[in-house]
Amino acid sequence: MRLTVVGANGRMGRELITAIQRRKDVELCAVLVRKGSSFVDKDASILIGSDFLGVRITDDPESAFSNTEGILDFSQPQASVLYANYAAQKSLIHIIGTTGFSKTEEAQIADFAKYTTIVKSGNMSLGVNLLANLVKRAAKALDDDFDIEIYEMHHANKVDSPSGTALLLGQAAAEGRNIMLKNVSVNGRSGHTGKREKGTIGFACSRGGTVIGDHSITFAGENERIVLSHIAQERSIFANGALKAALWAKNHENGLYSMLDVLGLNE
C-alpha cells in the first residue's frame, strides 16, 4: 500500500517513516512538510538518519497526494482538516492521529468522511484502545457511587490538554454510563472548589520532560479503588497502529472510524 506521511519532520512523522521502512506490505510514496521547510527537496532519509530512500521531501500537497493510496497524519488540527478535504476529493484513505480539534473541525472531518474512509483516534496503540474498552465495561458495571477520575502526563512540548487519549478514555467511561461527556467533565481543580459533584468525570493533567504518555483512570468507591492504566514507552506503538489502521481501511467503505473499529473492540 502506497502511503504519504504528512508533518514528516515531527516526532510522529519520523516514527511513521521508520515504521514503513521495516515492513513489506506498505511503501513510502511521499513525504510532506510545512511550506518553506529547510528539508524541502532533500531525500526523506535525512529525517530518520537512514540510507538513501529515494523519496524527495515536498511542501506541495498536490504533489504529495498525486500517487498515493493513503495519508498518515499526526499534524495539527487545521492541517488535518485540509488533508481530509484532499482525501475526500481524491478518494484517499486518511489516518488521523492529530488531537486538539474544535467542535467545528470535528464536524468538518465527519463531513469529509462521507466521501472517503477516515480512521481517527486520539491514540493508535492496541493497549490504549483495549484500555478504553475495559473502561467502558467497568463504567457500565459500576454505578455513580464510584467516582471517575482520569490522570495523564505528557512531555513538556505537548500543546493540548487534556490529551486526546484522556478524552478517549473519558468518552469510553461516559458511554459506559450512558451519559454525555461534555455534560459531566471537570477539567482540573484549583482553589476552593467545594464538594465533588456526584456523577462527574474529572481530568487532571501534568506536563514535563520527555514523557511519551502515561494515562490512568480511577474508579473510587467507598473503601476501595479500581485503577486501570497504560504507559507508552515508545512512539513506535502509535506508528504501528496507524499502519494497521491504513491496511484495515483499504478494505472498508467510506465513513469515519476509530481504532476500536480497526481492532474489533467497538461494541
From Swiss-Prot:
Q: Which residues form the active site?
A: H154 (proton donor/acceptor), K158 (proton donor)
Q: Where does (S)-2,3,4,5-tetrahydrodipicolinate bind?
A: H155, G164, T165
Kinase: present as a keyword of the record?
no
Catalytic activities: (S)-2,3,4,5-tetrahydrodipicolinate + NAD(+) + H2O = (2S,4S)-4-hydroxy-2,3,4,5-tetrahydrodipicolinate + NADH + H(+); (S)-2,3,4,5-tetrahydrodipicolinate + NADP(+) + H2O = (2S,4S)-4-hydroxy-2,3,4,5-tetrahydrodipicolinate + NADPH + H(+)
Say if the entry is tagged with keyword NAD: yes
Which CDD domains does the annotation name? DHDPR_N
GO terms, molecular function = 4-hydroxy-tetrahydrodipicolinate reductase; NAD binding; NADP binding; oxidoreductase activity, acting on CH or CH2 groups, NAD or NADP as acceptor
Q: What is its main location?
A: cytoplasm
| Cellular compartment(s) | Cytoplasm
Q: In which pathway does it act?
A: Amino-acid biosynthesis; L-lysine biosynthesis via DAP pathway; (S)-tetrahydrodipicolinate from L-aspartate: step 4/4
Q: Where along this sequence does the record place binding of NAD(+)? A: G7, A8, N9, G10, R11, M12, G97, T98, T99, S121, G122, N123, M124
- Keywords, sorted A to Z: Amino-acid biosynthesis, Cytoplasm, Diaminopimelate biosynthesis, Lysine biosynthesis, NAD, NADP, Oxidoreductase
A biological process term (GO) from this entry: lysine biosynthetic process via diaminopimelate
| Top-tier EC class | oxidoreductase
Q: What EC number(s) has UniProt assigned to this enzyme?
A: 1.17.1.8
Which Pfam families does this chain map to? DapB_C, DapB_N
A single cellular component GO annotation:
cytosol
Residues noted as binding NADP(+) in the record, renumbered to the chain: R34
HAMAP family in the cross-refs: DapB
What family classification does the UniProt entry report for this protein?
A: Belongs to the DapB family.
NCBIfam families linked: dapB (TIGR00036)
Q: What does this protein do?
A: Catalyzes the conversion of 4-hydroxy-tetrahydrodipicolinate (HTPA) to tetrahydrodipicolinate.
Record protein name field: 4-hydroxy-tetrahydrodipicolinate reductase
